[in-house]
């Protein structure tokens, strides 16, 4: 329900919230499957809270009315959306739109090549915008790797190289309390720039429903 943001209730002190933060991928059903998994595993003390806006980027936002629905950049969104009662942990799966959106002003006047980040800019953005703020709130921070994109309409080898470099950092950086490796869970082991069979929704960017179930399944149980 897009008109409803949050319902807070008074509950037991040992209950807590796990925040799932991201873009259109997180706006879809993997947090729902994660909440169902927690229920089925009798982990009734955790609330899975989705904080997702389709089309959003870490570093930039559009200033034209055409793309206002793509929302605010991370520096504006994150402090607002981390205002969650009882939150202890956040899984951040964000950044793919920073990589796939720029196409050049000859193709789209609002998507210049100058918007294309480097891996270092994405890493610094995650550290400065997300991790440092989350730490000030006392949250544990879990990185979520970016999913395969081969076949997406703006895909090319350079974009995928950037995605892979960023994913390596997300897996290895000591900034995080750990990594939820969504990429490894969903990619084709024989062709890792693509989804595994049955895991592509058809647009080569968003997962299928079975893939969303797999994303929920790969979240470590101790987060629940």
Q: Across the structure, where does each feature detected by a protein language model lie?
A:
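Extracellular glycan-modifying ectodomains
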Residues: 12-14, 44, 71-88, 96-102, ...
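Structural recognition of the beta-strand scaffold that forms the well-ordered cores
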Residues: 17-22, 26, 46-52, 88-94, ...
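Extracytoplasmic/secreted proteins, especially bacterial periplasmic and envelope-associated proteins
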Residues: 29, 33, 73, 77, ...
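Catalytic His-Asp segment of secreted/periplasmic serine-dependent ester chemistry enzymes
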Residues: 100, 146-224
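Phosphate-binding active sites in nucleotide-utilizing proteins
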Residues: 29-76, 80-81
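Oxyanion-hole/transition-state-stabilizing segment in secreted/luminal serine hydrolases
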Residues: 58-120
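N-terminal secretory targeting modules
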Residues: 1-21, 26-27, 40-44, 224
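Extracellular protease catalytic domains of secreted zymogens
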Residues: 102-113, 117-126, 144-161
């Amino acid at each position: 329900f897009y008109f409803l943001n949050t319902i807070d209730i008074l509950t037991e002190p040992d209950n807590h919230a796990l925040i799932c933060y991201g873009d259109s991928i997180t706006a879809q059903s993997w947090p729902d499957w994660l909440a169902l998994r927690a229920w089925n595993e009798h982990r009734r003390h955790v609330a899975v809270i989705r904080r997702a806006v389709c089309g959003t980027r870490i570093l930039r936002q559009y200033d034209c009315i055409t793309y206002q629905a793509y929302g605010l950049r991370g520096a504006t969104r994150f402090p607002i959306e981390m205002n969650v009662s009882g939150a202890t942990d956040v899984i951040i799966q964000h950044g793919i739109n920073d990589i796939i959106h720029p196409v050049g002003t000859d193709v789209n006047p609002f998507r210049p090549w100058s918007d294309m980040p480097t891996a270092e800019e994405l890493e610094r953005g995650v550290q400065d915008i997300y991790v440092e703020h989350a730490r000030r709130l006392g949250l544990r921070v879990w990185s979520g790797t970016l999913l395969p994109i081969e076949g997406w309409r703006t895909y090319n080898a350079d974009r995928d190289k950037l995605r892979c470099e960023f994913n390596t950092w997300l897996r290895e950086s000591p900034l995080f309390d750990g990594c939820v490796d969504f990429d490894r869970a969903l990619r084709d082991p024989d062709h890792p720039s693509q989804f595994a069979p049955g895991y592509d929704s058809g647009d080569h960017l968003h997962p299928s429903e079975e893939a969303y179930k797999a994303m929920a399944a790969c979240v470590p149980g101790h987060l629940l």
